[in-house]
Amino acid sequence: NPNWDECVTAFQKAVAIDGTNPVVLTYLGFSLNAKASLINKDRAAQKALYTEAMGHLERAKELDPNREKANWAYPLYQCYYLVYAANDPRTLEMEKLLKQQ
């Protein structure tokens, strides 16, 4: 299994060097998602990680809206689903986008 703390740290360093790379932003968001999914008892800590991931994934979406470089859509969908719930407009928008793939 990957060490998600190490992954997050490495991608944070990469984002500090170049915060406009949608691939790095997507991998950072994905790593934060994975780390959050391992938290079972602390819902606030889990939500904080999903929210942090969301920021990076939304930035990747801004930089690469057509997903030509990075596939940020599914991890962003996961964040929206787990933070805002299934019927939130943001979640539904990502779900629709994923079905168009």
What is the role of each PLM region?
Residues V24, K69-W72:
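TPR alpha-solenoid repeat register
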Residues N1, G29, A34-A44, Y81-P89:
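Short coil/turn linking the two alpha-helices of tandem helical-hairpin repeats
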Residues K13-A14, A60:
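Canonical positions in the second alpha-helix
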Residues G19-T20, P65-R67:
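Short coil turns that delineate tetratricopeptide repeat
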